[in-house]
């Protein structure tokens, strides 16, 4: 069975041939050997030779392995390696050595451009099959988010978000949320992540906060509000698409920071309404986003593709320094929201304040004690999000008892 077919056919008589896969004209810029690698990868995913559909995690690993192996292939076969000192090579003039260094650097830059182009070609070719995967819960979560935004409980959540009470600010955030519609027309991870980055930047500009008040704490609150203003659909699917299929080695620290902020905001919103969760196919114990790719640390080889115990692909740890700042900022946001919960639920019953105390210490205390931000693992953000989920449930459970 094909990995990417959302339907289950009874007969598979015609196996697609690699020569039947036509790449776009833009692929002509790639070396012929690289084009062959791209066609072979696409064929491996659409050919009916596999026993079952790939899970989102397995498919993400397949893409990341493909990116990794293609990058290594280009580097080893198309880029001349620097000569070893032990090799017998003719002496060169300084000008010749400098020219060789420049030529090699040009090829390295060209390799990165090729890798971006390869990602675009593969993801756009397979977009209808890999966006909002049938083996994932993306569609159910998108529907849950849409229902929440259309419900009255959205207003209750907005009232608990610590943002300035400024009508002009909220109007600007409504306008910023319109930028999310561009995601529906974009079919590559690069284009989608650029939209998320644009929205993130626009939120900062719309806040018009003084520089000393412009931090990740206020950004998270404004991001939550901006998402609640978005009347569209598939926002979770768009975010998961980026996290699954964007080349992990090409994600900058700023981009990871941006994606983590949207992940935290969406997770908080999805956990804010237990009533809707009980009416959906998603159980309250489920991870709302299941962004497994963002929590990965190591990569499996192609031979371990079907092994569920295999380690996922690597994260560039050097680009995670911004997560420490995010942890510090979310720490303050957590305390602020907890205070609002306590004030909100105190009117409910005499023992409501005791119910708030079980939340315990602020999230991810070790974020404040780590000496080197490069020691942080992006998977640790799950612990922070779980505290937000618990806090959101507490807020609306108490609100429902009033």
Curated annotation (Swiss-Prot):
A GO molecular-function descriptor: GTPase activator activity
Keywords: Cytoplasm, GTPase activation, Phosphoprotein
Single GO cellular component term: cytosol
GO biological process terms, semicolon-separated: vesicle-mediated transport
Keyword Phosphoprotein attached: yes
Gene3D superfamilies attached to this UniProt entry: 1.10.246.120, VPS9 domain (1.20.1050.80)
Cell location: Cytoplasm
Major subcellular location class: cytoplasm
Residue ranges of the TM segments: none
Residues of the VPS9 domain: 139-278
PROSITE patterns to which the protein is assigned, alphabetical: VPS9
Phosphoserine PTM sites in chain numbering: 355
UniProt-recorded name of the protein: Vacuolar protein sorting-associated protein 9b
Gene it is expressed from: vps902
